[in-house]
Each structure stands twice: as structure tokens, then as C-alpha cells.
Amino acid sequence: MAGPEIIVDARGHRCPVPTLRLRRALDKAPPGTSVRLLADDPMAQIDVPHFAAQIGATVLEVTHSGAVLSFLIRRD
């Protein structure tokens, strides 16, 4: 069963803003909580997985819907 999920909508912002908002959400989230980041800056496709690897978080899912990227990330 999946745990709770927090949505971070960073559409309309350029990197590094989506990554900074993701960091803030992960820092505040209890362990085991997933954070879904929505971004439309193509650089997020590179920045977000790199950031997740740096902090030891797991990228559970990456999807594209038009120009919107959706990342599901969890840090245990």
C-alpha cells in the first residue's frame, strides 16, 4: 500500500526553482512520504534525478504529459 503523497506544483518556474521546492517538501515530509513534483522546465528532467541521487532519495516514477514532467520521489 502506498503512503501519503505531497504534490509540489512548480509549473511555470525555471530551474533551480523546481528542485528547491522539491527539497523543501522532502525536508518537511515524514519518512516514507512520497512527493510528486510537477514541472514544465525541460532542465528538470536532468536536475531532479541528479538532486535525488545526491540526497539518497528514490525516483519512483517519471512521466510526461505534453510539456509537463511529473516526478514521484521518496526519501526514507
Predicted regions and their residues:
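Amphipathic, hydrophobic secondary-structure cores in small proteins
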Residues: V8-T63
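Intrinsic-disorder/low-complexity, polar/charged segments enriched in Ser/Thr/Lys/Arg/Asp/Glu/Gln
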Residues: E5, S34-R36, V68-S70
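Short, low-complexity, intrinsically disordered N-terminal peptides in bacterial proteins
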Residues: M1-P4, D76
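Core SAM-dependent methyltransferase catalytic element
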Residues: S70-D76
